[in-house]
Every structure is written in structure tokens, then in C-alpha cells.
Amino acid sequence: MAVWLAQWLGPLLLVSLWGLLAPASLLRRLGEHIQQFQESSAQGLGLSLGPGAAALPKVGWLEQLLDPFNVSDRRSFLQRYWVNDQHWVGQDGPIFLHLGGEGSLGPGSVMRGHPAALAPAWGALVISLEHRFYGLSIPAGGLEMAQLRFLSSRLALADVVSARLALSRLFNISSSSPWICFGGSYAGSLAAWARLKFPHLIFASVASSAPVRAVLDFSEYNDVVSRSLMSTAIGGSLECRAAVSVAFAEVERRLRSGGAAQAALRTELSACGPLGRAENQAELLGALQALVGGVVQYDGQTGAPLSVRQLCGLLLGGGGNRSHSTPYCGLRRAVQIVLHSLGQKCLSFSRAETVAQLRSTEPQLSGVGDRQWLYQTCTEFGFYVTCENPRCPFSQLPALPSQLDLCEQVFGLSALSVAQAVAQTNSYYGGQTPGANKVLFVNGDTDPWHVLSVTQALGSSESTLLIRTGSHCLDMAPERPSDSPSLRLGRQNIFQQLQTWLKLAKESQIKGEV
């Protein structure tokens, strides 16, 4: 693989799926920061578009039905897509389709990641499809509640079907060309489900860090965070895990003390909002949990402000006399480092301000759509991270009921309806036993989301790959000399799996079966 291409292999969408409150904002910014850092690093190489260099990808628009399940509703919207045809061998070559998730897609979506990296080997056409209601693919009427009912994973998959048919006509793609879907995080789930629901149209899929099991109370997230903080393989330790608990206990003590202690805490931890009310205290504690969880989720990724090893060093007073530091001081320093890296002044806001922001129907043209993704968590997935398990090192204050209240406050959706929606999602897609073949599920055991994915093969044609010490979508990140042997082997396995699939596709082409 050429050096310049390796530098462009940034994560396709490294945002968190955690769809609530301050945690959502912080993890979203962490993911965007990492992606932007990797893109700017590639640009810093001084790459030009001279002879032999990559051509700029093309952007296009597809007219899609707003409600394809209602034959009497002919309303439509424009869905953005990107195309990289630099390596395409023509009509019979494979199509690598990168599916967008809960954010906007730019030209980098077809210039980096698995599809672009693997395209030269097989002469593939690389296409990315932006998810409805995100980025610039927002229907008329914007983000009003009446419109959001047309936002769902099922409708997104219907868009994939119609896009495949329309793009085949537009680019004169042979009916025998195999279409292979790629995606990371929520988009990884979409990639797996596209193969599950439409095997006659999607030949195979690579699903990276795909949380295919919806869950209301996602306490398992912090179970993985706790284990990772103790993992010596990534710089954790029992001492580090204990220090996190001590630091959070000190934060809660100061919150209970009120007065000067609470005022000092607000300043030291950059809480932009009053801390007198329990709901605002939960916002701060949730943001602190997200900060530590984000360090674990993105551990080892280029551009991440802190690694687990570095965080543990801060909490344990590394680099100096430990008696001159406390876990709370280390946590405060971690907050400063992360906020500085993100160019952000506030770690948390008041609950009232958070609700007001999420009620805004003004579309976000870049990054993650917070209102849209919250709606999808309320109507399909849940994913509400809690700390009710005794093994959790954080605070129990950001409890599930207070999180579910946000669905009611913003969208008027009851806790019961959210629970029912989560159950329906698992019933429709099959949860962690989807039953799809020709799907490769790729996960890292450090990533808190891997517990919602498929990590054990359910059959000979439903493969899994678990990368030791791997974080969220790490297999999609830029190749580096410091990559672990398990990550290098994982990428080789992805290449080999794709090679096997495309050999099968070629044999089917010869037999006229594709």
C-alpha cells in the first residue's frame, strides 16, 4: 500500500453512539477531533494532484422517496453521495459501498478507510452514501418532529436499495458486479443489516465495531471501561481503576458540600452552569464519565488527546512524587488536556440548556446531528450508559430514569415506548444472532461497544474478528509503524476475507449466478 494512501486511512466516523446530554457532546467532539487530526496530518505531507496522484472524488445527488413504504406518498429528498473511480476497472469490477451513519460524509469517505485502501487490489469503484437526515441529506421541513418520523435504520436501508439500483444505471454497472458494504459503528450495523435484509443486492459486508444489539440500560459499557482501566496491556492497572473511583468520590463529596467547595469544583472542572440542582450535577458527572470512557473507547488512536496509559499516569501522579498529587488532581488535569485539545471551554452545561439545544430544529450541516441521533436512540436503540453495577468506578447519579426523561422532554416519548422500540429493533434484526451470511464482524476488545456486536462466529459464513487491545473502529484507522501485531494481523484477515468473497463472486459471474 502506498505511503500517501496509508496516511489517508482515517476512521470513517469515530463519533460515539452515546446519544445523551454532555456525554454526547464530549464524545462527539472527541471523535471529530481525531478524524480532523488524521486528515490534517495527511494534508501536511504536501500531497499534490500531479501525475499519478489521486483525483478529487466526485459528489452527486440521488432523489429518494421520503417514505418508500407508502406508495401514495411521492414526496422526496436529495441524498448526497461521493464517488472515487480512480481504480475502477469498469463494468464488471466490484463496488465498495461505504455507508454513512449518524453524521455528515465528506470526500474523505471515499479516499480513506477500508473501501479506498482495498480498491486498488481489485479495481473497485468506491461510493459512499450519506445517511438520510444527516449532513446535507436533510429533507424539506428540517428536523421538526413531524419529519423525524421518517428517520430510521429501516428507511436508511431502503435508501441503500434504491441507491444501488439508481447508481447501477447511472454508472452503467454490470448486474453481475458484486456490491460489498462497509461501515463503522452504527454504520457498521447498517452494513450488516443490508446484507441480512437484501442478500440478492448486497454480496457481502464488513461491519466494524457494529453494535447490532439494541439495549435500554447499557451498563456493560462501563463494565468494559472498568476492565480496560485495569489492563496492563494498554497501560492500565488495579491502582488506576481504584484511582478513578477515588477521584469520582471526591467530586461527589464536593458536590454534596455545596458552597465554596461546589463553586471551586465548577471552576476547576469547567462546568458551565450551576451545580446546585441534582440534574445539573448529573450532567457534570456524566461528562466526566464520558471523558474517561472516551479515553478507553479511542485508546491508541492517532489524534486522541489521551491514552489509557497517559490517563493512568495523571491519576497516579506519574512523572513525580505521588504524594504531591491526588487522583482528583489527575482527573482535573485530564479535563484540561481534553478541553484544550478540542478547543472547548465547557465540560458540561445545565440540564435546561442541554434540553433547549436538543429541541432546536436547526440542522447541523457537519459533524454529528445530536437531535437526530437522540431521536434514533429514543425510537430504536436505547444505548443509555449507566453506572448501576457495583463494578462501575464512576458515579451512579446519571441514572437510567433521568436519561429516559430526555426522550420525554425533547420528543414527548415515554420511557415505555422507548423500551418497546428497543425490543422491536432486536426482534426485527435479530440482535447478536442476525443470521446473515457473508458478513465479517470486526471488533476490538478494548472498545466498550464490542459487547453489543457479534464476537463469536455463528456459522461458517458469518465470520468474526476480535482484535486484542483494539479500540473503537481501530481497524479503520491509519496504518502506523507502531501498530500492534494483533491489529496488523486483523487487517490482513480482512483483506483475505475480501479476497475469498471476491473469488466466489468471480466464480458466480462465470456461472451467471450473480
Curated annotation (Swiss-Prot):
Main location: cytoplasm
Sites where a glycan is attached: 70, 172, 321
EC number: 3.4.-.-
Active site, UniProt feature: 185, 447, 472
Organism of origin: Homo sapiens (Human)
MF-aspect GO terms: dipeptidyl-peptidase activity; serine-type exopeptidase activity; serine-type peptidase activity
PANTHER family: PROTEASE S28 PRO-X CARBOXYPEPTIDASE-RELATED, THYMUS-SPECIFIC SERINE PROTEASE
Broad enzyme group: hydrolase
Tissues where this protein is expressed: Expressed predominantly in cortical thymic epithelial cells.
Signal peptide segment: 1-24
Function: Protease that may play a role in T-cell development.
Location relative to the cell: Cytoplasmic vesicle
Protein name stated in the entry: Thymus-specific serine protease
GO-annotated biological processes: protein catabolic process; proteolysis
Assigned protein family: Belongs to the peptidase S28 family.
InterPro entries: AB_hydrolase_fold (IPR029058), Peptidase_S28 (IPR008758), Ser_carbopepase_S28_SKS (IPR042269)
One Gene Ontology cellular component annotation held by this UniProt entry: lysosome
A matching Pfam family: Peptidase_S28
Organism superkingdom: Eukaryota
Keywords, sorted A to Z: Cytoplasmic vesicle, Glycoprotein, Hydrolase, Protease, Serine protease, Signal
